[in-house]
Regions:
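A detector of single, family-specific signature residues
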Residues: 1-401
Length: 401
């Protein structure tokens, strides 16, 4: 058996080919194009048996290796950072370490589990969605910062400053002087022109807040121009986000196991089930145990033992997008599942913070998801509560909202 470690980079890749006895047979560098891939293929075809270890599970090189049906393993970057002897990044050294760990059958070298095309598509959309959220937050923070400097009342008129109604108001009335000149009828007319659904609830409040005397900035022209620049960007990203949500739900519903995911309480909300499928995937062999999924999702704590001492810590090394998806699912489930709501309250009563209590609930859900996933069974709330009662565990103490 031969072992190949590949240190991935943007434009080139360092390779280390190791024999079964640990001797280095070859250390070369290939380019990130078909010329380099063909050079790699020529090297591998000359070997009777070879296993490949690489740091990432996506990208053109990984796709090409999968298409060529090579035996592929993944060692995540955070593991490599921890396992480096000197903690210093070195491409050739990393390629050697990848081959070395694979030769030792290290537990951190995980077999590559190919996902379906639908899950791969959904995961790509989920990454885009996360980046859109980050960009929207960045632009929104700029808008808030500018308004605080010269127009703070605009932050209080609507539920959020980056909603379409708020952006439309700022576009028509970009200065506090223009806003204060509005009559009651003018505010009502604006809301009706924007087809605002909550006119009766918001009209009096908006008008009253505009009548409160406001401090004036000595110079505000620069702030106004910045706000005018941000408005179309935030409006565009709002529409893109909504379109992305529709596309993600469309792709999710095309997956053969969509109904299985939707059987869990709280997953019918926007993207709740879609994000779980995107980040967990549909390769059942990827997580050999429930604990493997819980650790991957970051819901299970890390337990450290030394002699007679034992300490439990928050798990930092995990898939952070999966943790966010699991936390969101746990929050949504409390509104639709009596036992989930009672379990959360029980953790609060034990003195846990809301964040930790919700994470504990997410950890329970990850175990349930893994178990039913392996059994290919639909979630049944009544059956689950009966199982908890039979095992002497806490049963439903509160009705779901």
């Amino acid at each position: 058996m031969h072992y190949l470690g590949i240190d991935w980079a943007t434009d080139k890749h360092d390779l280390c080919l190791m024999a079964d006895d640990g001797s280095i047979l070859s250390q070369i560098e290939i380019t990130h194009d078909m010329v380099g891939f063909n050079e790699l293929n020529k090297l591998l075809k000359a070997l009777p048996d070879v296993k490949i270890n690489i740091e990432r599970s996506d990208g053109l090189l990984v796709d090409w290796l999968v298409q060529q049906k090579y035996d592929l393993y993944i060692t995540p970057p955070h593991v490599m950072a921890y396992r480096r002897p000197t903690r210093v990044k070195d491409d050739k050294g990393d390629a050697f370490l990848l081959a070395y760990l694979l030769r030792l059958k290290d537990a951190d070298c995980r077999p590559y589990n190919a996902q379906s095309h639908t899950v791969t598509h959904l995961k790509q959309l989920a990454r885009t969605y996360n980046r859109v959220i980050v960009e929207q937050r960045r632009l929104c923070n700029q808008l808030i910062d500018n308004l605080r400097r010269y127009y703070p009342v605009a932050l209080t008129l609507f539920t959020k400053v980056n909603t379409l109604i708020s952006l439309a108001f700022l576009e028509q009335y970009p200065t506090p002087e223009q806003a204060q000149s509005l009559t009651y009828e003018g505010v009502e007319r604006f809301l009706r022109e924007q087809h605002y659904r909550y006119i009766q609830q918001r009209l009096d409040l908006v008008y009253a807040r505009l009548q409160v005397p406001m401090p004036q900035a000595s110079v505000q022209a620069g702030y106004v121009e910045h706000v005018k620049m941000l408005i179309p960007l935030l409006r565009m990203i709002h529409h893109q986000r909504q379109a992305l949500i529709k596309e993600m739900n469309k792709v999710f519903l095309s997956h053969p196991e969509a109904d299985w995911w939707l059987s869990f309480p709280g997953t019918k909300g926007p993207l709740t089930a879609a994000l779980l499928l995107a980040w967990i995937g549909d390769a059942r062999t990827r997580f050999p145990t429930a604990n493997a999924l819980q650790a991957y999702a970051g819901t299970a704590p890390v337990t450290r033992r030394s002699g007679k001492s034992k300490s439990v810590h928050f798990r930092k090394a995990c898939s952070h997008p999966t943790r966010r998806a699991a936390d969101n699912f746990a929050r949504q489930s409390r509104r639709h599942s009596g036992w989930a709501r009672a379990y959360f309250q029980h953790r609060l009563d034990r003195g846990h913070s809301p964040a930790r209590a919700n994470r504990d609930l997410a950890n329970r859900w990850m175990k349930i998801i893994w178990t039913l996933w392996q059994r290919r069974e639909i979630y049944d709330e009544i059956k689950h509560v009966a199982n908890r009662s039979r095992k002497g565990q806490q049963v439903v103490l509160a009705e779901a909202v």
